[in-house]
UniProtKB/Swiss-Prot annotation:
Keywords on record: ATP-binding, Cell inner membrane, Cell membrane, Membrane, Nucleotide-binding, Phosphate transport, Translocase, Transport
GO MF terms held by the record: ATP binding; ATP hydrolysis activity; ATPase-coupled phosphate ion transmembrane transporter activity
Record's subunit section: The complex is composed of two ATP-binding proteins (PstB), two transmembrane proteins (PstC and PstA) and a solute-binding protein (PstS).
Name by which UniProt lists this protein: Phosphate import ATP-binding protein PstB
Name of encoding gene: pstB
Gene Ontology biological process terms from the UniProt entry: phosphate ion transmembrane transport
EC number per UniProt: 7.3.2.1
InterPro entries, per the entry: AAA+_ATPase (IPR003593), ABC_transporter-like_ATP-bd (IPR003439), ABC_transporter-like_CS (IPR017871), P-loop_NTPase (IPR027417), PstB-like (IPR005670)
Pfam families attached to this UniProt entry: ABC_tran (PF00005)
Length: 249
């Protein structure tokens, strides 16, 4: 297994936000996390690269293994972890730099100075993110001039440039129009050949289109985790059925 979470609990102060979540994720698959707002799915996603460490009064208990390594071990370098486990946020967040420098940024921060290598890596990353053909003639222009959908794909390229093996996406298309959303979904499908992807989404159609497995969270608990087709067509739990049929959420 690429990822193994065992009895994961998260507390924000006295608030018990995530309650004993256990699930395993295979390499080169897409896993969707669904559930109503505040159910714990984004909190669980942030556990994968220890982004919760940056939140005051947040405490994480349980084990999370990535490639067999306990990522909560004191010996784990969080900078290296976040390089290996990239993250794309809900709202596109390009830096106020050129398109080229947005992608090159992570390489430079990690000590890469070889100009030819950086040039090649920027092109490779933009191609991986299905953006190269749209920006190859304007790499020196500001990333802020791109459309919202292009900015989000640029953020994906920026994450890919440092060669992660896992890509976390927290509602990556929720702020985008339908055409841009379709491009992001197609990109997710293509990227899973090279990466293990975990995506938080409120859009159940998106979860069913893009993912191999789906986890349904409710009030901090993992209610059901199954193959996506099975979960959406023949859920085992009544709460899952009620949610996917729109009876609450």
């Amino acid at each position: 297994m690429k990822i193994e979470a065992n009895d994961v609990h998260v507390y924000y102060g006295l608030d018990h936000t995530l309650k004993g979540v256990s699930l395993s994720v295979k390499k080169n698959t897409v896993t969707a996390l669904i559930g109503p707002s505040g159910c714990g799915k984004s909190t669980f996603l942030r556990c994968m690269n220890r982004m919760n460490d940056l939140i005051d009064n947040c405490q994480v208990k349980g084990n999370i293994l990535i490639d067999g390594v306990d990522i909560n071990s004191p010996s784990v370098n969080t900078n290296e972890l976040r390089k290996a486990v990239g993250m794309v946020f809900q709202k596109p967040n390009p830096f106020p730099k050129s398109i080229f420098e947005n992608v090159a940024y992570g390489l430079r921060v990690n000590g890469v100075s070889n100009k030819e290598y950086i040039n090649d890596k920027v092109e490779w990353s933009l191609k991986q993110a299905a953006l190269w053909d749209e920006v190859k003639d304007k790499l020196k222009k500001s990333a802020l001039a791109l459309s919202g959908g292009q900015q989000q794909r640029l953020c994906i390229a920026r994450a890919l440039a440092v060669e992660p093996s896992i890509l976390l996406m927290d509602e990556p298309a929720s702020a985008l129009d339908p055409i841009s959303t379709s491009k992001i979904e197609e990109l997710i499908y293509n990227l899973k050949a090279s990466y293990t992807i975990m995506i938080v989404t409120h859009n159940m159609q998106q979860a069913s289109r893009t993912s191999d497995k789906t986890a349904f969270f409710y009030m901090g608990e993992l209610v059901e985790y199954d193959d996506t087709r099975t979960l959406f067509t023949n859920p085992k739990k009544k709460r899952t059925q009620n949610y996917i049929t729109g009876r609450f959420g």
